[in-house]
């Protein structure tokens, strides 16, 4: 069975995803820069909508080779969003 995921970066996009009955959303910000980790409140809104919610974890624009401190930040964000109740995370 085909699953449909919609990248969302606003409250309006979350509402549209719910209206379209997509299988899940990927919450992110700054899509014009390739996407970054979204705000906590936007992720909360996606979870509260009842949609299956995945969160993009990307601390900065640019390449995907991270320093030790960036990797520590990524791990903390994954743990935090997991405790919030997201269904998964997206890296890259």
Protein language model features and the residues they cover:
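Alpha/beta enzyme core
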Residues: 3-31, 48-49, 67-91
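Alpha-helix-loop-beta-strand connector modules within alpha/beta enzyme cores
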Residues: 35-61
